Amino acid sequence: MNKKWLNIPALIALLAAIAFGSVAPAEAAPATSVSNKQNFSTDVIYQIVTDRFVDGNTANNPAGSAYDATCSTNLKLYCGGDWQGIMNKINDGYFTGMGITALWISQPVENIYSVINYSGVNNTAYHGYWARDFKKTNPAFGSMTDFANLISAAHSRNIKVVIDFAPNHTSPAMETNASFGENGKLYDNGTLLGGYTGDTNGYFHHNGGTDFSTLKNGIYKNLYDLADLNHNNSTIDTYFKNAIRLWLDMGIDGIRVDAVKHMPFGWQKNWMSSIYSYKPVFTFGEWFLGTNETDANNTYFANESGMSLLDFRFSQKVRQVFRDGSDTMYGLDSMLSSTAADYYSVNDQVTFLDNHDMDRFQVSGANGRKLEQALALTLTSRGVPAIYYGTEQYMTGNGDPNNRAKMSSFSTSTTAYNVISKLAPLRKSNPAIAYGTTQQRWINNDVYIYERKFGNNVAVVAINKNLTSSYSIAGLNTSLPSGTYTDVLANSLSGNSITVGSSGAVNTFTLQAGGEASGLTRRRQRLR
């Protein structure tokens, strides 16, 4: 479906005359991936729904009605993906070829084995969010030995491993029906702590389901029918501090925390302090925001909790501008300015186009150039970029579970794969991309030209989202040194070059329809 885009002109014209420097400023964090667990600014994350990626070991596939070998009849069942399958793709170079330096995988803990029927459809815990024991593995993904092997394989390729972790809840439960599912039972390395019904120890909240009307309502009531854990209970508090230490000891490099909006802020800050005092790793949380939504509590959490957040403000705006066409580049510029003002560490927020809870960015039958441009923006913007599995293969799918379909292909020749592979390494080679500030340099409804700057390191990116009209760009002033900037993606796409004068002024040039151009500089070394 993507081959027709391989010969399109001027999709990404990445212009580089690398000038004046080869060493990052002293304040820049080390770029080596697995040696720096606390800062992911130089990394590109690849999010994997483990069950939907590769079945590397058929022996651990669930038995009976929980498993669909075709992964097509019912996407709510297990499909067979596991850690061995991820290792296979690590070892064959699929990730390193794309420039990926971190893998975010599904929650690895033991989940319930029950098949739960909702409205006539069987549901399983393939996604990893229906936990029963946070100190054991999900056998459908592999054993502790398999997990250790995954960490080892990733680290041998200088790839970090981030685990999803969902301490907000266990599994579906009903207050009046202990036989529903597995009654939300929580185990401690095989020993039952308690279930939702008959909860005499107060391990869970029993306030009904949240209607999302207030923050407090969402914290102390169940998220849908998921048994909501009481983190103010000392046993639960100790349990999760010990549970995450087990995974830290296994060698993980990062944590994505599910549903942070639905847990007490004070407990999360204390939990993060426990993590940082034990083995600090980069941690980011999920706080969903809808289109054009802002929330002072979201901002406060990002600034005060000790963890970063998935940047839904970035994602929703990029989707509006590039995917849906419902906003202009002025809206994009406004979002970048407001988030830079709101988030103290805006470069540490995790940016993305889509994930397992959203419609995929690529729309069936839509022009793939929109996706490719949005990827280029995400990879060169502030924040830590995360790519959802299959994006590079133009996978489509609206809503759960269609947005979690089986990985469709592992082609390394798609335009999207090559865009990622060319732009991802820039986060290590140019500190402006990893650590820089962002300044708008030229704008209209369709064109956005922005500059990233860190010390004397500069990157200038120009994007024309109009797929049918070119624009003459005049009066553009930058911090780029003088020189001619040529297309480093010439092997993939046909780009143009630009000429910069001594004052940083760019000679008038034409930005092609659907085009993007980036100029990069570093100090002391010149490449012509």
Curated annotation (Swiss-Prot):
It catalyses: Endohydrolysis of (1->4)-alpha-D-glucosidic linkages in polysaccharides containing three or more (1->4)-alpha-linked D-glucose units. Residues 1-28 form the signal peptide. InterPro entries: A-amylase-like, A-amylase/branching_C, A-amylase_C, Alpha_amylase, Glyco_hydro_13_cat_dom, Glyco_hydro_b, Glycoside_hydrolase_SF. Coiled coil: none annotated. It holds the Pfam family Alpha-amylase_C. Binds 1 Ca(2+) ion per subunit. Its cofactor is Ca(2+). One of its GO terms (molecular function) is calcium ion binding. It comes from the Bacteria. GO terms for biological process: carbohydrate metabolic process. It is an enzyme of class 3 (hydrolase). Its EC number is 3.2.1.1. CDD domains: AmyAc_AmyMalt_CGTase_like (cd11320). Gene3D superfamilies: Glycosidases (3.20.20.80), Golgi alpha-mannosidase II (2.60.40.1180). The record marks 357 as: Transition state stabilizer. Ca(2+) binds at residues 168, 228, 262. Keywords: Calcium, Carbohydrate metabolism, Glycosidase, Hydrolase, Metal-binding, Signal. The active site is at 258 (nucleophile), 286 (proton donor). Monomer. Belongs to the glycosyl hydrolase 13 family. This is Alpha-amylase. It comes from Niallia circulans.
